[in-house]
């Protein structure tokens, strides 16, 4: 056994864990970030003194610097599951940097904030010690090894170690010194650690390991000064810290010339008799997101500015909670959460998910008895507890941390019980969270009794209702992961929040996850399986972010902003009822602005100041209640902060009677021939193909609009959330699917009567019996208008359809369009709370969404009118759905990356009866029945007009 394979000794000469701080005054801080000498060895056992050094920037991940290929894997270990042993041929990166010391009068410490996975430290050729725990701080005292003058620090980083079995998180697997590395020079008699606790009854208690001077400040105002190892401060009329009111006091500790500052938030955490989460005595709703450290082009490395920007963006989406999946973040990230107001569920660097797959043909069940897991193995107890201790000690003084999480997807065993025992011995306030103790894959009775929160992943809406109605648990219930945001989505976050607001015990959850993990190669986002060195991979499952890897937003991002909005409203019969969904903040200083729109006009607009208290509602009466419209009516409501920021805009359609458009009903001239029916007018000429059951030519003002015949279709390029059902829709194998991606229209007969053409048809996937028996009826009028009627039945027993509608493939020149529908972003029947019904202008380029794996996008629901380039218009008396794309469904379906789509050769217009919803089934539950296109009888009418 090599030294780094012993789970009972995962460090040597590492300092005891302590709270994070950077001392000032007599202490000196020296960042070692920057250029280091570097040598990469494919086999650490054969490493020699480098004859030639490369240069590498620290922090960085060596896979992104040309040493090894990146590797993305979710559950499977990238090596044999044979704990505690790792591959005999174990790569190593050797880092070296020189520093110059002018004096040795102080104590010197080398601190590594993050290094993967095992690091051995040498100073001037002398061994100092080693550490494991990639995302955990490691501190080494190096005073003895240093000398006055030039010194050489060497850090040997091993790719794998025993700790790798505890770090099987869903992410690209990187190595190197990926967080800050720095030196501290401190007085020889200095404070090592301190602890700050607060009570919402005004107290701040500071405990240190020295008899120190301790000062308490409110901003720059000194409130009180005391001396001692334990000092208690009472703050008069304190401003309490919450995610909505992130007010911070400052504690300054002075000892032997050193100055240590710590920002402090006064708050307490409890659970109510109703099993609500209470912050400062008030019930709090968790509106969260899971946050991995991942950065566009940099892997696990994030600068201070990038971390701050993430917190700002997350806060801007009305999120109030981050789960640090699945390890502690950089400590500065937590400081930003304190500052901006984000609750944190701080997770230990712990996941052993791969043990589910250590034997073939095993279902998704944590069988902790058949095989020894790290969680049940006594040899691993010390390392489990050590990782929890290091997590707690570093971040114990951060106000934002409201829960400690033991880790992720590791099963429950006695070693986790020991971790909980440790936490309970040092922290009596914060809650203990561990999804594996109460998982849908198996609940541990011991684990359930020890944790403070029942946490699950991706429980269905029905499952949550069942738990709440049957009172299954006597603890707060949350989803640490829900609404899987992969690709086009998520589509169900609004529905989950409906239940949060209904059931006090359901305290909320954290969306999976914040940002896509990708590696950019020649401008193209790459993912698992794209790199030759990957021995196992999980494809594009890493592209599951609420934002793209560069932090740009998608429709799902805006949907979450709306679902998490701190208000909701309902409009009915002139009554506008507004509900404040803040936990602590009244609307007194906020502005509520509403607009009532009818067609293309705003008929009423007003700004209001309403003193709505948290979780309370107030109704106002509007002057206008639209009764008639040509296209549609709606009411939009903005909530504007005192600083002028629009926190969210929500919209609600208003039901009103449609004013029917006057139509020219003069029949067009029709000529019926053997295989074609011709229609001609002053500025148009159409040809209906009897063999195809639809038009194959539409000439308007001398220009042929069609690039291909019009056709009925039911397939869509699968979104990531279709990944578990695509085999039932498409030809993925020989036996399961309806094969809708290779569909045939069989025309049984065509009847021409005056200006009416009726085609009786079937739609079938290749090798399959008809899935849809239907009739297309078109009526052609003298002004060029075509009235379409679709009337048909879906085969009994057939699966629900992804969509159903007509495809009009137009010439490529037809790029611009104007529409009255839900916009401006793409939207679907379940993901439509981020849009409003209005007139919008767009084009094919604007509609395209650059998902890392190309997929269905660009649908607009609740449509009444679509006009392409002032040439052709689609209208309907009842709402329809449409999509305008520069790419065909086939192009999007076959491409695995954006550079594989090919060139745009046409403008593809879909006029759809309906599309099934988005959901979050890429990892979450099946799409809710109400959002499935499961109707068996279909009737759909729309007009095609000359614009």
Predicted features, each with a name:
Residues 1-18, 22-23, 37-43, 65, ...:
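Accessory beta-strand-rich segments of carbohydrate-active enzymes
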Residues 121-123, 202-226, 251, 575-610, ...:
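Beta-strand-rich binding/interaction modules
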Residues 144-150, 207-273, 628-665, 672:
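Extended acidic/polar, glycine-enriched regions
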Residues 64-66, 159, 242, 628-631, ...:
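Beta-strand/loop-rich accessory regions of lumenal/periplasmic or secreted enzymes
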Residues 61-64, 69, 76-85, 132-134, ...:
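An acidic-aromatic loop/edge-strand motif
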Residues 95-97, 136-140, 229-233, 616-622, ...:
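Short strand-edge motifs at loop-to-beta-strand transitions and within beta-strands
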Residues 167-190, 513, 517, 524-571, ...:
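Catalytic cores of secreted or luminal carbohydrate-active enzymes
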Residues 1-24, 58, 65, 73, ...:
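Extended substrate-binding grooves/exosites of carbohydrate-active enzymes
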């Amino acid at each position: 056994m090599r030294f780094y394979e012993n789970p009972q000794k995962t460090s040597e000469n590492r300092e005891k864990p302590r709270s994070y701080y950077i001392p000032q005054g007599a202490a000196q801080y020296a960042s070692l970030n920057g250029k280091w000498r570097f040598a990469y060895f494919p086999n650490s056992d054969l490493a020699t003194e480098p004859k030639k050094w490369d240069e590498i920037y620290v922090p960085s991940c060596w896979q992104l610097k040309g040493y090894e290929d990146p590797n993305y894997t979710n559950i499977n270990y990238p090596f044999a599951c044979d704990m505690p042993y790792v591959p005999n041929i174990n790569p190593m990166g050797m880092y070296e940097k020189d520093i110059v010391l002018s004096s040795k009068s102080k104590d010197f410490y080398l601190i590594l904030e993050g290094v993967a996975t095992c690091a051995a430290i040498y100073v001037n050729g002398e061994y100092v010690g080693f550490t494991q725990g990639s995302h955990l701080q490691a501190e080494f005292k190096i005073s003895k090894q240093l000398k006055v003058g030039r010194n050489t620090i060497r850090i040997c980083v091993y790719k794998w170690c025993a700790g790798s079995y505890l770090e099987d998180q869903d992410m690209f697997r990187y190595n190197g010194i990926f967080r800050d590395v720095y030196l501290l020079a401190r007085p020889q008699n200095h404070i090592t650690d301190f602890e700050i606790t607060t009570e919402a009854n005004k107290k701040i208690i500071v405990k240190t390991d020295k008899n120190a001077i301790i000062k308490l400040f409110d901003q720059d105002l000194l409130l009180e000064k005391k001396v001692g190892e334990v000092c208690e401060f009472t703050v008069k009329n304190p401003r309490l810290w919450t995610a909505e009111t992130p007010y911070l006091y400052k504690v300054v500790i002075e000892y032997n010339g050193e100055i240590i500052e710590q920002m402090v938030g006064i708050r307490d955490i409890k659970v109510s008799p109703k099993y609500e989460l209470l912050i400062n005595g008030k019930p709090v709703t968790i509106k969260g997101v899971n946050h991995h450290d991942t950065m566009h082009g940099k892997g696990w490395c994030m600068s201070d500015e990038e971390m701050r920007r993430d917190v700002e963006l997350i806060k801007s989406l009305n999120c109030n909670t981050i789960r640090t999946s699945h390890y502690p973040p950089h400590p500065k990230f937590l400081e930003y959460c304190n500052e901006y107001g984000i609750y944190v569920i701080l997770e230990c660097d712990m996941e052993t998910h791969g043990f589910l797959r250590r034997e073939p043909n095993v279902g998704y069940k944590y069988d902790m008895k058949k095989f020894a897991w790290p969680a049940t193995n006594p040899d691993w107890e010390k390392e489990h507890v050590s990782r929890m201790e290091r997590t707690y000690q570093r971040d114990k003084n951060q106000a934002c941390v409201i829960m400690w999480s033991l880790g992720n997807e590791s099963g429950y065993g006695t070693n986790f019980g020991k971790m909980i025992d440790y936490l309970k011995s040092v922290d009596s306030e914060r809650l203990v969270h561990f999804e594996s103790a109460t998982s849908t894959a198996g609940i541990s009775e011991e684990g359930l009794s020890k944790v403070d929160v029942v946490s699950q992943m991706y429980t269905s809406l029905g499952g949550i209702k069942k738990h709440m109605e049957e009172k299954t648990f006597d603890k707060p219930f949350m989803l640490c992961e829900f609404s899987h945001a992969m690709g086009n989505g998520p589509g169900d976050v609004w529905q989950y929040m409906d239940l949060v607001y209904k059931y006090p015990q359901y305290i909320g959850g954290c969306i999976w996850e914040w940002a896509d993990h990708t590696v950019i190669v020649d401008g193209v986002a790459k993912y698992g399986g794209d790199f030759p060195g990957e021995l196992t991979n999980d494809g594009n499952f890493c592209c599951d972010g609420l934002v793209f890897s560069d932090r740009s937003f998608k429709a799902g991002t805006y949907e979450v902003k709306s679902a998490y909005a701190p208000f909701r409203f309902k409009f009915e019969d002139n009554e506008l009822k507004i509900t404040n969904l803040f936990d602590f903040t009244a609307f007194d200083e906020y502005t509520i602005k509403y607009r009532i729109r009818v067609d293309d006009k705003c008929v009423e607009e007003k700004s209001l100041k309403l003193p709505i208290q948290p979780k309370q509602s107030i109704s106002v009466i509007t002057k206008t209640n639209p009764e008639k419209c040509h296209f549609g009516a709606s009411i939009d409501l903005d909530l504007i902060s005192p600083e002028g920021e629009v926190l969210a805009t929500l919209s609600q359609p208003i039901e009103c009677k449609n004013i029917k458009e006057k139509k020219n009903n003069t029949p067009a001239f029709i000529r019926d021939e053997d295989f074609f029916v011709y229609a001609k007018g002053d500025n148009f000429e159409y040809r209906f193909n009897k063999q195809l059951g639809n038009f194959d030519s539409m000439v308007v003002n001398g220009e042929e609009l069609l690039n291909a015949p019009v056709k009925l279709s039911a397939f869509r390029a699968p979104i990531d959330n279709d990944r578990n059902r695509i085999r039932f829709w498409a030809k993925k194998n020989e036996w399961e699917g309806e094969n809708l991606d290779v569909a045939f229209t069989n025309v049984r007969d065509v009847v021409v009567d005056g200006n009416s053409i009726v085609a009786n048809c079937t739609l079938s996937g290749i090798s399959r019996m008809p899935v849809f028996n239907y009739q297309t009826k078109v009526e052609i009028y003298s002004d060029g208008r075509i009235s379409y009627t679709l009337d048909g039945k879906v085969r009994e027993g057939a699966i629900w359809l992804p969509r159903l509608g007509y495809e009009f493939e137009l010439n490529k020149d037809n790029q611009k369009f104007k529409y009255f529908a839900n916009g401006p972003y793409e939207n679907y029947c379940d993901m439509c709370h981020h849009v409003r019904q209005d007139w919008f202008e767009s084009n094919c380029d604007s509609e395209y969404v650059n998902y890392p794996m190309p997929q269905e996008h660009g649908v607009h629901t609740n449509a009444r009118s679509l006009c392409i380039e002032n040439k052709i218009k689609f209208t309907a008396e009842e709402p329809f759905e449409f999509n305008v794309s520069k790419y065909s469904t086939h192009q999007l379906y076959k491409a695995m990356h954006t550079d594989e789509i090919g060139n745009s050769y046409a403008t593809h217009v879909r006029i759809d009866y309906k599309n099934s919803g988005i959901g979050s089934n890429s990892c979450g539950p099946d799409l809710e029945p109400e959002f499935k296109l499961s109707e068996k009888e279909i009737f759909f009418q729309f007009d095609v007009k000359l614009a």
